[in-house]
């Protein structure tokens, strides 16, 4: 990811909140939607009966022609720019009794477009969900002597990356000296 990583994270969080019809900064939202931990073995384990949604954004490992779709333009700055669309995957893991309903709701509502709706929230941050993601997978995960419900959802994304060509050339501060010979 580029320097806009926190902007991307905020946009994804807000889009997920919009899918579920929750205000982004409420206590209920903060306890329900969480970014995945980088070290899962050290992450806190919520109660088996609690609904929790973890998400993470990672680059796709396979070479996808869409990830190399580059267009050259100058965005009114008179500097050449390359606009690339990099392939990423949004992995959403839902736990708890309502995990399947949450996963289906996110999959269905992520593509709604309009003011304050998920697709527009993502588009403002340069994130474009690829239509028709696969259906969520319902799994059961062992937790002690009991089973915990889990639904996995993977959504392919394209993230816009703008590269502006800028070469610093030494500025001419005074005209060059001209020597005339007779």
Per-region residue spans from a language model:
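Short acidic, gly/pro-rich beta-turn/loop elements at beta-sheet edges
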Residues: 65-67, 100-102, 163-167
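Acidic-leaning, charged glycine-interspersed low-complexity segments
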Residues: 101, 111-162
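Small/polar-rich, solvent-exposed N-terminal microdomains that initiate assembly or binding
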Residues: 1-76, 177-182
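Short amphipathic alpha-helices in soluble, non-transmembrane regions
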Residues: 104-111, 170-171
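Mixed-charge, glycine-accented linear interaction segment located at domain edges/termini
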Residues: 156, 160-182
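Short beta-strand/turn micro-motifs at beta-sheet edges
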Residues: 75-81, 142-143
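Oligomerization/assembly interface segments of phage tail-like spikes and tubes
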Residues: 82-98, 106, 148-159
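Soluble non-cytosolic domains of exported or imported proteins
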Residues: 3-7, 96-101
């Amino acid at each position: 990811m580029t320097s806009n990583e926190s902007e991307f994270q905020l946009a994804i969080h807000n889009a997920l909140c919009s899918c579920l019809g929750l205000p982004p900064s409420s206590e209920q939202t903060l306890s329900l939607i969480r970014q995945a931990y980088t070290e899962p073995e050290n992450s806190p384990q919520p109660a088996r009966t609690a609904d929790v949604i973890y998400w993470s954004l990672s680059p796709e490992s396979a070479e996808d022609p869409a990830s190399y779709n580059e267009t050259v333009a100058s965005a009114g700055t008179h500097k050449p720019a390359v606009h690339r669309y990099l392939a990423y995957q949004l992995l959403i893991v839902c736990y708890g009794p309502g995990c399947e309903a949450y996963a289906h709701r996110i999959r269905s509502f992520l593509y709604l477009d309009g003011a304050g709706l998920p697709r527009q929230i993502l588009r403002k941050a340069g994130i474009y969900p690829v239509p028709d993601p696969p259906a969520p997978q319902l799994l059961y995960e062992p937790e002690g002597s009991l089973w915990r419900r889990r639904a996995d959802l993977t959504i392919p994304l394209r993230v816009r990356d703008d590269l502006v060509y800028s070469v610093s050339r030494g500025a001419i501060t005074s005209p060059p000296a001209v020597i005339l010979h007779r």
